[in-house]
Amino acid sequence: MTDTTAQHVVDTVANAAATPEREQPFAALGLKPDEYASIREILGRRPTNGELAMYSVMWSEHCSYKSSKIYLRQFGQKVTPAMKKNLMVGMGENAGVVDIGEGWAVTFKVESHNHPSYIEPFQGAATGVGGIVRDIISMGARPVAVMDQLRFGAIDEPDTAHVVHGVVSGISFYGNCLGLPNIGGETYFDPVYQGNPLVNALSVGVLRHEDLHLANASGVGNKVVLFGARTGGDGIGGASILASDTFSEGGPTKRPAVQVGDPFAEKVLIECCLELYRDKLVEGIQDLGAAGISCATSELASNGDGGMFIELDSVLLRDPSLTAEEILMSESQERMMAVVKPELLDQFLAVTAKWDVETSVLGEVTGTGRLVINWHGEEIANVDPRTVAIDGPVYERPVAYPSWIDALRADSASALALPVSGDALREQALALLGSANLADKSWITDQYDYFVGGNTALAFPDDAGMIRVDEESGLGFAIATDANGRYCQLDPKEGAKLALAEAYRNVAASGAVPAAVTDCLNFGSPENPEVMWQFSQAVEGLSDACLELGIPVTGGNVSFYNQTGDVPIFPTPVVGVLGVIDDVARRIPAGWQDEGENIYLLGITREELDGSAWAATVHGHLGGRPPAVDLAAERRLAETLHAASQQGLISSAHDLADGGLAQALTESVLRFGVGARVWLGDIAERDGVDAASALFSESTARAIVSVPREDDVKFRGLCDGRGVPALRIGVTDAGAGTEPVLEIQDLFAIEVAELRSVHRSTLAERFGPVVG
């Protein structure tokens, strides 16, 4: 027998029982010795190679949430009946589903594809988009938009440009080919992400209530069908290796093939699925992402009648040399698995044939409570599917208060030199405007199609993306994502609250009512007790804040092992907030459109410069405590903004966050090129702050709005009645010359042309022409 033939000898269940002492490469597959011992105990024998492959990917950190599960339960525990009222599907499914009225529902979710995007930036990012879109399809929805949250290393590092070009082009390629508008997100640069970029992709879809589908395999005798792209060798072990281990300082030491995406195949798959749903041909459905067939079969069986029989050799292959174990672990893209009644199978196959989507019947649902997999007539797996998909190991990792955090918090920004003169304030405002993190991101966003589909109401650079759902009524949704790793490094509990508060505020500023949350929790190694302390604090803070704001977490993702060597990233919980708007015609943009309107600052300004963009940009400083979170004030502000938009009292709204008032003013000016005259004296007098804090503080629960003069009295009355401090700080104005100007009275003035030049040049100068 040749070596090649020997490699393909099938390890059957009978053989596993007969050879209990055979050594197996469990460690190479990411399993710990005690986990391997648990598998043997569950099975009463050693696992077959196929079973070992299944357990290794499904018990990985990425799939099992074994280090985070004990904390994530808080999201399901800290809820009220009112929070559940409009929640059709919560955590545990492929994506959350929210009732938005008129028989419509929205499903949305954010997930990470961090490690693959470092190994192969283009394909890693592209397949991140494809994977999250399939989660949306699997709920019975039509995907209608995507967003992304990106974190890269220092902007001036040569490797950063390579990763940025690949990631952005991968996202734009896949999303644009699918015909999905990319309506928002954030991009930040920091050396802490140098060896570990974050690529978090969000997708959102719409569906009628009656079209909702879930991932379960119910109905003994129903057929299990795999359809979509053929199965290849790409992504094998991705969940257990790429997403569940750290990178060494020299780069990734384990390099399984990153998945390869085909957006045109996915576009056809979307339309095929929607027709199958319309014709009511699907009983249950699951997309194939992390862990591939291992995940789809075990999860469908666990959530249904508990049993399934699969003929693995019926899987259509791109590479006929793949072993059974490789087929089980493959993460080839653009694949779905459906459960179909036998009497509807011919109709199902006719629809997939119409769309030229390759389809194979793999097996059927059984009532045995076992997942049995055969390979060329021999049994290679016989497991309780719940032990694979649900009842995996759960760890309560050691938690330790970081040894360095007290010193970091003691190093407050209050000791930093503040600008006093008008010239110094002007110089520093421009420095922030042109800094890597606050500069215009159109070099990135212009590679995305914002308006494909014709239903985009708001997109970059507005505070939230907004999509019209119903053409007749104007019903729509808004969505915003936010994160601030610098705040979380100072205080992960308060930092997570701040991320939620900003996304909540952004949605409210668009005119929508915040309704639900998704999150992607990006952290270092869970084997580091200090990282686990950060994680536990962030989850506690986020769950507490959701409860106080009255909006439920519908699902999301945890991404651990984001570190290079022993250096973890900043804790970076990404929070997405979905809001509902009854008519997108009432949407509010984040910039001034008309001259002669009054500019109001809503909320109170405090001397809060710790962790700020000003401290980082001007002084290279990180220390102290993040801004105080006042969720009651956030709620009052959101309700006021919504009421003002409904009554037509405001023509623009922009939240205050990174860069404070200075950044919000310049972005509002640049949105439509309308200048402004602003005075800071009343802020200083009322709030007791100096000019620098008035401009650069990042105090929360604040926004600036523009109000037509004829609505001024009504608007003031609205704010007074709702307990929201409102201070008139300026007017929109063309300026005395031919060029619009942003004038901070008695301090400085900057022409809009200069603001635009500074704001737009940073990324283009650093990254050059768009590649591809």
From Swiss-Prot:
> Sorted alphabetically, which keywords does the UniProt record give?
ATP-binding, Cytoplasm, Ligase, Magnesium, Metal-binding, Nucleotide-binding, Purine biosynthesis
**Binding residue positions for ATP:** 65, 109, 519, 556
Give one Pfam hit by family name. Answer: FGAR-AT_linker
Q: Where in the cell is it found?
A: Cytoplasm
NCBIfam families, alphabetized = FGAM_synth_II (TIGR01736), PRK01213.1 (NF002290)
Complex and partners: Monomer. Part of the FGAM synthase complex composed of 1 PurL, 1 PurQ and 2 PurS subunits.
Sites where the protein binds Mg(2+) 2? 135, 287
Catalytic residues, per the record, are: 62, 113
Its family?
Belongs to the FGAMS family.
GO function term, MF aspect, one: phosphoribosylformylglycinamidine synthase activity
The pathway it acts in is:
Purine metabolism; IMP biosynthesis via de novo pathway; 5-amino-1-(5-phospho-D-ribosyl)imidazole from N(2)-formyl-N(1)-(5-phospho-D-ribosyl)glycinamide: step 1/2
Name the CDD domains for this protein: PurL_repeat1 (cd02203), PurL_repeat2 (cd02204)
Enzyme Commission number(s): 6.3.5.3
Under Gene3D superfamilies, the record lists:
PurM-like C-terminal domain, PurM-like, N-terminal domain
- Report the superkingdom from the record: Bacteria
Q: Which organism is it from?
A: Leifsonia xyli subsp. xyli (strain CTCB07)
Binding positions for Mg(2+) 1? 111, 557
UniProt name for this protein: Phosphoribosylformylglycinamidine synthase subunit PurL
Protein's gene: purL
Q: Which GO terms describe its cellular component?
A: cytoplasm
Main EC class of this protein? ligase
**Reactions catalysed, as given in the entry:** N(2)-formyl-N(1)-(5-phospho-beta-D-ribosyl)glycinamide + L-glutamine + ATP + H2O = 2-formamido-N(1)-(5-O-phospho-beta-D-ribosyl)acetamidine + L-glutamate + ADP + phosphate + H(+)
Tell me yes or no: is Metal-binding among this UniProt entry's keywords. Answer: yes
Q: Which GO terms describe its biological process?
A: 'de novo' IMP biosynthetic process
